[in-house]
Amino acid sequence: IRFHEGRFYMVTNNNTTSENFYVYTDDIYGEWSEPITVDQGGIDPSLLFDQGHVYFISNGQDEHGVNSVIQCEIDIETGKKLSPSKPIWQGAGGRYLESPHMYHIGNTYYLVVAEGGTEYGHMVSYSRSDNVWGPFENYPHNPVLTNRNKAPEEIQGIGHGDLVQKADGSWYIMTLGFRQIHK
């Protein structure tokens, strides 16, 4: 979910039809718009609102079939692409690259992704660039958050990170994870 200029946007995918779409509302407790589709495949899509432009980001493959983060610029009113879809990063080397989110903080673009699948190998990795289109520099200490190979930890499968900034300027990360049920 994203909030921009008084409007909430929820972006997701339909696994049955392989379509990506978003809906919006000015009142999070009220009615939402009809789905607006974007002609870009992948799962776990995200939106970046940046300096008058809107970027649609998802996972996909580059021209050689390598898993990559794919991005295009869109018209937020119609969902129509304003640029071709372009691979911008191949991840930090983990399998199942997904859930890309981009943030423009200061003069730097940060790309946060999930890798490793949503089970025990799940992790959060990131890269950065001076340009929204890259090239993106891999953080050398990826993954930045994981409990993989830490069997005694109560919470496992940590990944799919999304950053949240508080009003005081501090940043936090929200992730998913699971706890084993012992019977």
Place the predicted regions along the sequence by residue.
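Carbohydrate-active catalytic/glycan-binding domains of CAZyme proteins
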Residues: 1-183
